[in-house]
C-alpha cells in the first residue's frame, strides 16, 4: 500500500459566548477525494461548533448562562499513534485541512489521535498533564481530546477533560492573592484504555498551583463524593475551602460553582498536603510567617535553595507532623542557610523517614543557617541504610557555620534494625554536628540503631548530638535516657554526645540515665559515658569545660574478646590532647560485663588531662586534679578545702591556657547536694 496523506483537523480553542447547550462531542463530515490516495476530513468541534454543556456543580440541573465554545486556529497540531509509532498533523493556513503522514500505514490496528500534539507519547500511551494551568484565563492547549479511527480517514474526537468556572468569596477586597493551590483525591495517574493497545494516561497532577484566582480550571472526570481542596494565600492570611462533588464530573462539560473561602487554621501536616507560600517577604523586619501546615510544606520546597540564603522565617503557631516526612533541605550541597525562628512554638507528632533521606534525617536534613527558639515534641524513627546515617529531631546534620540555638526536644529518637555494615549517629537535637549547638535541652529518650551482625558496623547515640565532630556544643542539658544499641564493631552512648572528635563541649549537664547495650549482637567495644560515650581516635583534640553528670551510667556487654568502658564523664578517650576542666561526676556507675576487660570509673578508659575535677566516690582515672567530695555539709572541712583547691587550679589553668581554652567557671556550694559551677 502506498503512503497516504491525511488532511485533518486540530484546534486551538477560542473563548466565545453563546446561549446554547449541547452535550454531543463531535460530528465529523468526511469527503474522500477522487483518487483514493488522499482524503480530506472535515470535522466539527463538540456540539457541531456550539459550546460545551454547562452544569452547575452544586445545583441539580443545567444552568442558563453563557458557555464556552471552541474553534480551530491556524497552526494547530495533534498526534496520531499506531503500533508504537506517531506522527504530527498540522492545520494549513486559512483552511480546515490538516496535513500529516499516517504512522505505520501498512500495518494493522486502529489509529489513536490525541489533541494537542504536546501530549507526551510513550509507546502506545499518551500522557495528559494538567499541572501547567494558568490563572489568567482558559488555556486552550489543555483541552485534551482523543479520537479513534480504523482506516485513518475518519477521526471523531472526544473530550478527556471537564471545565470548572469557579466564583470565589470570602477574601477581603483589600487583600491581594499571591498563590492558589488545588488538590484532588483523584489518583494522579488514571489510565483509560480507549482501545486495544492504545492507552490514555490522565496524569493530572495531584496538586495544581496558580499565582492568582483562576478563571477556569480543567478537571479530570470524577465521581460523586470526590473532594477538591482549595488553599489561597494573600498578603495577609491563608484561606481554604473543600468542595465535594454532588454529581459525577463528565468530560466535555463546563461546571460552575461558588467557592466559599474561610481563614485556614490547619496546623496538622500530613503527606500530600499542598504547598502555600506564607505571608511575608523573608526580611528580618518582615519574615515569612510559618502559620500553618501549608506554609510548612512550602518551606520544604524552598528551604534548600541557595537563592534563599539569608532569608528569615518565623513560626507563629504550634504545628503537628504525622507520617513519612521529607525533611527541609535534603541536599548536602544545598543546606538550609536561612534564619528560622521557632518563636517558642512547638512542632509535635511523629516523623518517619524513608531510606531516601537517611543520610541526614530530622525536621531539617542539612543546616548551615540558624535554627532557634524551636520546641520539638516529635517521635522520630528511621532506618539508616546509608553509611553515616545521621538523625536528630531538629537536624540530621548541622554543618560548619550552622547554628542551633535554644531549641528543645521532648520526643523520642529511635533507630530501626539495620543489617548493613554502616555507621549511625543519633542525637536528641542533632545527629551529626560540625557547627554550633547552644542552650538546647533534650527530654526525649534516644536509642541507637541496632546495626545487626555485619562486621564494621558502629552505633552512636547522644542526648544532644550523636557525633560532635567539630565546632562547639555549649550550655546544653539532657534529662532523658540514652541507650546504646548492638553493633559488631562498636557501640557508644553518651548523655550529651555519643562520640566527640576535635571539638569543644562547654557547660553541659546530664541528669538522665545512660545505658550501654546488652543483648544480641554485642559489640566488640561497648562504651557508656555520663557526658561523652567515646572520643573518636588518637588524633582527636577535644576540650570539655564545666560539664557535670548527675545521672546513673550502666555499662553494657561486649564480646568476650572485647571490652566495656563505663565512665561518669566519658566512657573512653583516646585523644592525643584532651582536656577536662571543671568537670564532675555525681552519678552512680555500674560496670559492664562479659568483656575481656571491663573498665568503670569517673573517666572510663583511656588517657586524660584534667584540671579541677571531682567525683562522688572513690573511683577515678586521673593521677592528679581529682578531688573526692561528699554531699554538701557545712561541717565537712575536707570538702570546703577541696572547693578552694579546685578554684585555685582553675585560676592557674587560665593563666597558661590559650584564650579560646580559658575556663569561665568556678566551683561554689549551693543549696544543692553537690557543688555547682558558677556561670553555668
Residues of each region from the PLM?
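Hydrophobic alpha-helical segments of integral membrane proteins
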Residues: 14-18
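Alpha-helical interaction segments
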Residues: 10-11, 148, 655-659
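Surface-exposed repetitive/solenoidal architectures
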Residues: 265-680
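Sec-type signal peptide cleavage vicinity
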Residues: 2-9, 19-269
Amino acid at each position: 500500500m502506498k503512503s497516504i496523506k491525511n488532511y485533518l483537523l486540530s484546534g486551538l480553542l477560542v473563548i466565545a459566548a453563546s446561549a446554547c447547550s449541547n452535550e454531543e462531542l463531535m460530528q465529523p463530515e468526511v469527503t474522500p477525494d477522487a483518487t483514493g490516495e488522499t482524503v480530506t476530513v472535515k470535522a466539527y468541534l463538540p456540539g457541531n461548533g456550539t459550546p460545551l454543556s454547562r452544569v452547575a456543580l452544586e445545583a441539580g440541573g443545567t444552568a442558563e448562562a453563557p458557555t464556552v465554545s471552541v474553534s480551530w486556529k491556524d497552526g494547530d497540531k495533534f498526534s496520531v499513534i499506531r503500533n508504537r509509532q506517531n506522527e504530527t498533523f498540522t492545520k494549513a493556513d486559512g483552511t480546515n485541512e490538516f496535513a500529516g503522514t499516517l504512522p505505520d500505514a501498512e500495518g494493522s490496528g486502529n489509529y489513536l489521535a490525541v489533541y494537542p500534539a504536546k501530549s507526551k507519547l510513550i509507546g502506545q500511551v499518551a500522557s495528559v498533564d494538567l499541572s501547567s494551568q494558568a490563572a489568567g484565563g482558559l488555556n486552550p492547549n489543555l483541552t485534551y481530546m482523543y479520537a479513534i479511527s480504523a482506516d485513518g480517514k475518519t477521526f471523531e474526537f472526544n473530550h478527556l477533560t471537564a471545565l470548572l468556572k469557579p466564583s470565589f468569596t470570602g477574601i477581603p477586597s483589600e487583600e491581594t492573592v499571591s498563590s492558589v493551590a488545588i488538590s484532588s483525591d483523584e489518583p494522579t495517574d488514571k489510565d483509560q484504555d480507549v482501545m486495544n493497545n492504545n492507552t490514555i494516561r490522565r496524569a493530572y497532577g495531584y496538586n495544581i498551583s496558580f499565582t492568582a484566582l483562576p478563571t477556569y480550571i480543567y478537571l479530570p472526570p470524577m465521581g460523586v463524593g470526590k473532594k477538591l481542596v482549595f488553599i489561597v494565600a494573600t498578603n495577609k492570611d491563608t484561606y481554604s475551602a473543600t468542595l465535594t462533588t454532588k454529581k459525577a464530573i463528565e468530560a466535555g462539560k463546563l461546571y460552575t460553582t461558588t467557592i466559599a473561602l474561610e481563614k485556614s487554621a490547619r496546623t496538622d501536616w500530613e503527606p500530600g498536603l499542598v504547598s502555600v507560600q506564607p505571608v511575608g517577604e523573608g526580611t528580618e523586619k518582615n519574615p515569612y510567617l510559618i502559620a500553618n501546615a501549608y506554609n510548612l510544606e512550602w518551606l520544604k520546597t524552598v528551604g534548600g535553595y541557595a537563592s534563599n540564603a539569608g532569608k528569615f522565617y518565623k513560626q507563629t503557631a504550634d504545628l503537628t507532623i504525622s507520617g513519612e516526612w521529607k525533611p527541609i533541605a535534603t541536599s548536602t550541597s544545598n543546606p538550609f542557610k536561612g534564619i528560622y525562628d521557632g518563636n517558642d512554638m512547638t512542632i509535635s507528632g511523629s516523623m518517619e523517614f524513608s531510606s531516601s533521606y537517611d543520610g541526614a534525617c530530622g525536621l531539617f536534613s542539612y543546616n548551615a543557617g540558624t535554627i532557634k527558639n524551636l520546641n520539638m515534641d516529635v517521635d522520630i524513627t528511621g532506618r539508616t541504610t546509608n553509611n553515616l546515617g545521621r538523625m536528630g529531631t531538629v537536624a540530621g546534620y548541622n554543618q560548619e557555620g550552622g547554628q542551633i540555638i535554644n531549641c528543645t526536644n521532648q520526643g523520642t529518637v529511635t533507630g530501626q534494625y539495620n543489617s548493613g555494615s554502616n555507621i549511625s549517629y543519633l542525637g536528641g537535637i542533632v545527629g551529626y554536628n560540625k557547627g554550633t549547638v547552644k542552650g538546647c535541652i533534650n527530654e526525649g529518650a534516644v536509642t541507637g540503631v541496632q546495626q545487626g551482625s555485619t562486621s564494621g558496623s558502629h552505633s552512636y547515640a547522644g542526648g544532644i548530638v550523636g557525633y560532635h565532630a567539630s565546632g562547639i556544643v555549649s550550655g546544653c542539658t539532657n534529662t532523658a535516657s540514652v541507650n546504646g544499641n548492638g553493633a559488631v564493631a562498636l557501640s557508644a552512648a553518651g548523655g550529651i554526645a555519643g562520640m566527640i572528635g576535635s571539638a569543644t563541649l562547654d557547660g553541659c549537664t546530664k541528669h538522665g540515665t545512660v545505658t550501654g547495650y546488652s543483648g544480641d549482637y554485642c559489640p566488640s567495644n561497648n562504651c557508656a559515658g555520663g557526658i561523652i560515650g567515646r572520643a573518636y581516635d588518637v588524633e582527636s583534640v577535644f576540650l570539655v569545660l564545666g560539664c557535670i553528670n548527675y545521672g546513673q551510667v550502666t555499662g553494657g556487654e561486649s564480646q568476650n574478646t572485647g571490652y566495656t568502658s563505663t565512665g561518669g564523664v566519658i566512657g573512653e578517650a583516646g585523644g592525643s590532647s584532651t582536656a577536662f576542666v571543671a568537670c564532675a561526676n555525681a552519678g552512680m556507675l555500674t560496670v559492664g560485663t562479659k568483656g575481656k576487660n571491663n573498665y568503670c570509673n569517673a573517666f572510663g578508659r583511656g588517657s586524660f588531662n584534667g584540671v579541677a575535677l571531682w567525683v562522688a566516690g572513690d573511683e577515678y582515672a586521673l593521677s592528679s586534679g581529682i578531688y573526692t567530695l561528699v554531699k554538701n555539709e557545712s561541717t565537712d572541712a575536707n570538702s570546703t578545702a577541696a572547693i578552694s583547691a579546685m578554684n585555685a587550679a582553675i585560676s592557674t589553668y587560665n593563666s597558661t591556657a590559650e584564650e579560646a581554652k580559658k575556663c569561665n567557671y568556678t566551683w561554689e556550694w549551693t543549696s544543692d547536694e553537690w557543688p555547682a559551677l558558677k556561670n553555668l
